[in-house]
Amino acid sequence: MPQPGIRPQIAPNPPAGPGDLNNDLLNSSQWTDQQVAAAGIPIIDIPFVTFGGGIGSFVTVDYLRIRGVPPEAIRVLTPLNTPWESYEYLTRVSQIPRQERLRSDSASTPDNIWGFPSYAVREAFSAKGIKNKLFPLWNVATEPIFSNYYTPKAGAAFESMEKEMNRIRYNEMVVRGQVRMVRKRFGGGYFTVLTPPDGASRTRRIAYRSRFVHIAVGYAGLKFLPDLEEYRTKYNDFSRVVNAYEQHEHVYQTLQGRPGTVMIRGGGIVASRVLQRLIDDRDRLGLQTQILHVFRTYITGSHGDSIFMRRKGGDGWAYQGFNYPKSVWGGQLKSQMRKLEGEQRAALYKAMGGTNTPVRNSWQAQLRRGRNEGWYRTIVGTMDSMTPGANGTIRAQLKTAQGPLDGNVDFVIDCTGLEADISEHRVLDDLLVHAGAGRNPIGRLDVERTFEVRGTRNFDARLYASGSATLGGYFPGVDTFLGLQIAAQEITDDLAKVGFCGPLGVARSTAQWWRWVRNRQI
């Protein structure tokens, strides 16, 4: 049996329990059925497995069900209770509760592959009063010239996904647990190894044997800035120096009880949201909160490499309606990126990338007032070090163009949102080592235009991936609502070519849309 890419164990493995992974399996890049059986791991046959269980899994399953694949042929392996659970957690801690609006456009509807009726149309129909009904329609009709881009409320997105989840019988396909690894099966197919919850199975692991696997694990992990991590670890202070993507409600509650100074780091959408929360609390409760905002790069106006790749800016911020220019989802940038390889693709990603935030009149008015009244100040520089200061404060030392600058603050909220390397995710790292997967030009998981993970095909079996782990591929907007749907369409188009699901032609699409409109279960 061929065993390419055997990886030596750095540390001894714990003794294998009943139905657990043993050294033979851990060290083998391809498994036989006999190897798995000898380890006492039960094997379950299922044609299509998706794991992660977030919105990426949800929209892919939605496409498959609409294309006629029965629930019995699909399994969703996930620790999540709902597909939007992780996403809602991240939005909530980064100050986007259900009543606030997301950074997504009207037609990016994960519950509706057709995009119509859009969120704006639905909001208009459900609103009370003529003014409230006309507002979303007028907004999308005049954006972005006479109004800011329309964006849906987070709660509307989650509620509509719940409705579609029930319509496609999503929960019938869900198996609870944490995926440990995916390995190629000798002779074709894959084994996806699941660790079920305690007490849910008589064995430690279960192996799902399938022809198709889809990976949608979301972000590989959160990466903290070195100075932030050093301070937290050295001084065991995880409450005053926080990342915006972790639970930090205590910061706002403390400031509601006494005056304080907060340092904000970062210039993206999360920084905008954190500032809004601080200023809303200040206005609503009459607080005396002082805000220091540190920009590493201060934007004073329009900027970019050429007149065709320019972005508005001002007061430190780079402005853009969405994560990427809208043409990446269906215009010239999507077409251009699809043709590029290697360094050329990486260069275009760099040109399109960079931290940015949408223009919202309410935010700009808040910050303008803060600058005029003196309680919101900006600093251009980088953090040199942080140490405990007097009276329970943090002494922050900055490097600026004018020289060193230091001062004491009560809290530091880091809003840079750095993402960890894919090798820090156990399953993705295992794919790199054992499955033949590689990295794309910017270091993420390398996928084909069909979102098949390059180098992992096993005879007629295919392994796909979508979401942020694949950023850097032939399609840029992968970690967005619409991007996940476009990836799901590409994947299911490819599956239709090999006969796993039906084509989505005009007749079937129209019939299925009509079923969606009437909320008819499929």
Predicted regions: what they are:
Residues 1-81, 143-269, 273-522:
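Flavin (primarily FAD) cofactor-binding/catalytic cores of flavoenzymes
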Residues 79-117, 300-320:
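Conserved N-terminal glycine-rich FAD pyrophosphate-binding loop of Rossmann-like flavoproteins
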Residues 100-143, 325-329, 333-341:
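Flavin (FAD/FMN) cofactor-binding and adjacent substrate-gating region
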